[in-house]
Every structure is written in C-alpha cells, then in structure tokens.
Amino acid sequence: MIEVSHVSRNFGAFRAVNDVSFSIPTGQIVGLLGPNGAGKTTTMRMITGFLEPSEGQILIDGTDISTAPVESKRKIGYMPESAPLYGEMIVEDYLKYIAQMHGEDPAVKVPELCKECGLKEVMSKNISELSRGNRQRVSLAHALMHDPEILILDEPTSGLDPNQVEDVRAIIREIGKTRTVIVSTHILSEVETLCSRAIIIAGGKLVADSNIEDLKEKFGHELSVKLTVGKTDYEQLEKDIRTVNAVDTVRKVSETDQDGLSVMEVLVSVNGIQEIRPELCKMLVEKNYALYEMCIERNSLEDVFHALTTNETTEAKK
C-alpha cells in the first residue's frame, strides 16, 4: 500500500508539488495523469525515493520512505520510460545479472520472469537487437526481479505498435491482481483500458482522485456531438454553435488534412441529454458551413482531463 500525505516539493522558490494526498491499496491499478509541468513526474520520483519531499510524508506499507529508504525501496519496482539496459548483453545473461544483484536465485527467478513477461523467444538475443516492445518486456522483468509489492510504470507502452501495446497491457493486468500498480501515461485511452481509478494532477495540485466512471459522470457531459467541418473561422463557428439551444461547451479538437480536404473537428457538449443534432445541422447548413460528419461521442477520460487541467479550472482549485 502507498500512502501519500500532504506532500509538497520545492525547487528553490518554485513549488512543483503542493499538498498532494492519496492512498493506493494492494491489487489496484491506478493511472497517474497530468499535463506537462503539472508535477506528475516529481510526484513519481518522490514515491520511488529519487526525490525527498520538502513537506509531508510518504509511507510504503507503513514505512516512511524518507527515514527508511532502503527498506521501502525493496518493496518498489520501477520501470522508467526509457530504461537503461545493457545493449551488448544477451537477455538471459542480463536477467541473471539483475537477479544476482538483488540476491535472488537466477535459476528460479529468470525462468519465472521469462514466462511472466513473454520473453521465451528472445532470451538468447542481444538486447541491442530487440524491438522496442521486447525491450519494454525486459525492463518489466527487471522491475519485477525482486518480487516488489508495488510497481511503478512510466509510459509503459509509449512507442509500441498496436499488437505490442496489447501484449504489454495484458501483462500489466495480470501483475496488477496481486500488486499495487501506478501507471503514468499521456495515453488517456490506456488509463481507461488498464485502470479502475485515475489520479489527476494539475498546477502541482491534486484536482481529481476517483474511479474513472465517477470522473466521467462528475466532470464530463451526458452527451457530446463531434462535428467535422471544412476549415473556417473557428471563433465565428463557435458563436454560431452557441446559438443552438442546450449547447454547453464548444471545443476545437483538431485541424487536419483528410483525403485532400482541410477539415476541423469540433466537440460540442450538451446540457443533459437533449437531442441537438437536427437544430445544429440546420444552423450549419443555413450558415453555409461545409459539414462532412456529425456523430454522438461518449464521455471519455480525455474530456474529463481537459475539463480539469485547463488554466481556469486549475486556478479555481488553488
């Protein structure tokens, strides 16, 4: 179990993390989210013992990581985004070396982790020859070598192809049945797929901590409509959309070129569950907008993340 209690971290006069508190029990996979510069990485580094809090306390299974760092760190496995592996070593030799460093029996632990992390096909290869997906598997085996109770993963599927992503996620799900797991990622769909709970940090503060469905219900909208229109003056488009009854928020999602067309994607959220598509479509046609697509969007963690990490929301939480 991890208990983070009123933790802050200063870098000179700058407060990167400000009075953050949460706890994570065994057997839970939690997503740690936040925009760049929000304090997410600093929080992870304090939990893993790489940084000491300026204020507050972090307990690892009841042990203060600041006063008993060695004992606490024995319970933590950490997989950084770009793990420093020895490329010239054969996978099997590398894992035996890591086992010996942890005082584990290589004859027992290496075959066990080879099976758990799906490394059978690459055990005789040099690490430098491995795909990114297999390097991630080796990094995960490294993090699990001393059988930690807590596993912290930083961007575990970043840069992987879809098949590799699903393979790594399956491993993490299995690991999470018996361990506390924190997944830090910018891929919001990954948190929805892997995690039952999300902790969101913005502006150095905790802005949300709840299970994902509750977050969607509390901070999302019951109904959203996504529009794909020809590129146009967004400010005028937004004003026109807001004339439609029951529209709550309007947000430009992207501007791209698709099949030779320059298009803009706009997400329109609705108060309640009122059907606005007929009126919205009529307005767009009458105003001579080029409407290519209109579809209903389910609430997503991306909508929640956007709502909680905008400057206005963050300031309101201070």
Please name every model-derived segment.
Residues R9, G34, T249-E255, I296:
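Hydrophobic/anchoring residues in structured secondary elements
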Residues S269-K318:
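C-terminal coupling/interaction segments
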Residues C114, E129, T256-D257, N299:
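Positions that flank functional sites
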Residues K73, C114, R169, K216, ...:
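Conserved protein kinase catalytic domain
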Residues A170-V183, I187-S269:
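ABC transporter nucleotide-binding domain
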Residues I2-V4, R9-A202, L206-A208:
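ABC transporter nucleotide-binding domains
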